[in-house]
């Protein structure tokens, strides 16, 4: 849980906040997320998501398209001694990440957002927060 601001260095490395590192473990999977952010899953959680996606089958064109994007972007990451991960260029490009990032702890994963995109998203979603909560029965 939580929201943290960090910057990507010139080599494409990003510090993962200590609070979030504990839940991720030392090795984890980063991939293309929804809403143009990146999803970062602990290995066991990624396997659970993978199994669920495998269950969608190959006959649905929507399932095939989603699986292609989700798995083609997946990369195993490892923390360096400073608590950083190297985000590949293709994932940074997908999420529009150039320098400033927002790292968000969300339930079973971590999301990495370009700071500008997070600001836009959170403003839009914030306006609908109550409405969304009501629709979800919260």
UniProtKB/Swiss-Prot annotation:
Domain SpoVT-AbrB: 3-45, 74-117
The keyword Transmembrane helix appears for this protein: no
Single GO BP term: negative regulation of DNA-templated transcription initiation
SUPFAM superfamilies to which the protein is assigned, alphabetical: AbrB/MazE/MraZ-like
GO cellular component: cytoplasm; nucleoid
Keyword Disulfide bond recorded: no
Disulphide bonds in the chain: none
Keyword terms, alphabetized: Cytoplasm, DNA-binding, Repeat, Transcription, Transcription regulation
Gene Ontology MF term list: DNA-binding transcription factor activity; transcription cis-regulatory region binding
Entry's localization field: Cytoplasm, Nucleoid
Family stated for the protein in its record: Belongs to the MraZ family.
NCBIfam families in alphabetical order: division/cell wall cluster transcriptional repressor MraZ (TIGR00242)
Summary of subunit composition and partner proteins: Forms oligomers.
Full protein name: Transcriptional regulator MraZ
Lineage of the organism: Bacteria, Bacillati, Bacillota, Clostridia, Eubacteriales
């Amino acid at each position: 849980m939580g929201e943290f601001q960090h910057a990507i260095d010139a080599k494409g490395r990003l510090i993962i906040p200590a609070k979030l590192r504990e839940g991720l473990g030392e090795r984890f999977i980063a991939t293309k997320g929804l809403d143009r952010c990146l999803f970062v899953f602990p290995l066991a959680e990624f396997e659970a998501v993978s199994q669920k996606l495998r269950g969608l089958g190959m006959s649905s064109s929507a399932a095939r398209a989603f699986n292609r994007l989700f798995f083609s972007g997946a990369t195993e990451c490892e923390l360096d001694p400073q608590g950083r991960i190297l985000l590949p260029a293709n994932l940074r490009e997908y999420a529009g990440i150039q320098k400033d990032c927002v790292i968000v702890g969300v339930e079973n994963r971590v999301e990495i957002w370009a700071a500008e995109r997070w600001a836009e998203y959170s403003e839009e979603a914030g306006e609908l927060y109550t409405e969304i909560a009501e629709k979800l029965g919260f």
